[in-house]
């Protein structure tokens, strides 16, 4: 008997735009099941820009990327020699990962009332208080009814970047913004860390690696 079965699909499409631009699309779907299922870690870099590296994990995972790539400078003469051209990119990402029986909901438009966690109780020394199970004791805010489309457990981001070759390595400079497509929902989900305003703050990242 097999201890695990895994399906992993990676679909890509490239469309030339004018003479030097490229529209690049990718979809990856991963599912593993059995007594000892595999897990897929992803996030950051070219997979889910704006989120921490490998911050998504699950035996079920999906993510999609769309990128518009276009040249800005064909080549550059620098004090250390000729560098590769500089390319611009606009990107958007959508995805999520989850485990079996987790109760995962990628997105919804249904109205629901939620009670946000606004923080956690601490003692006089500033240490987190724990309940009998060892979990932090939460502080709850007032219930709020949320309406409209939003990502529940799914995540998305968008932004722009610059790419170049330096000393033989592809280097990326990205500016990205995270979103769940609903600021009222983000205010509840991230109430303990500053709400939507903090979640949507631009994030800058530098990474080395090839595009998909």
What is each residue range found by the language model?
Residues 1-212:
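C-terminal transmembrane beta-barrel domains of outer membrane proteins
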């Amino acid at each position: 008997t097999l201890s695990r079965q895994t399906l992993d699909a990676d679909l890509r499409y490239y469309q030339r735009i004018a003479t030097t631009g490229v529209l690049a699309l990718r979809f990856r779907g991963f599912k593993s099941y059995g007594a000892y299922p595999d897990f897929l870690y992803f996030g950051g870099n070219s997979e889910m820009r704006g989120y921490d590296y490998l911050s998504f994990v699950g035996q079920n995972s999906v993510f999609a990327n769309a990128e518009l790539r276009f040249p800005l400078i064909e080549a550059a003469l620098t004090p250390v020699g000729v560098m590769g051209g500089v390319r611009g990119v606009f990107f958007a990402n959508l995805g999520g990962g989850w485990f079996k029986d987790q109760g995962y909901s990628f997105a919804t438009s249904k109205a629901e009332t939620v009670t946000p966690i606004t923080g956690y109780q601490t003692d006089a020394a500033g240490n987190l208080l724990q309940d009998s199970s060892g979990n932090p004791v939460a502080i709850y805010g007032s219930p709020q009814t949320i309406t409209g489309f939003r990502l529940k457990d799914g995540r998305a981001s968008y932004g722009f970047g610059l790419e170049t070759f330096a000393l033989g390595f592809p280097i990326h400079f990205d500016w990205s913004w995270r979103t769940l497509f609903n600021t009222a929902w983000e205010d509840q989900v991230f109430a303990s860390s500053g709400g939507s305003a903090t979640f949507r703050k631009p994030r800058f990242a530098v990474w080395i690696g090839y595009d998909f």
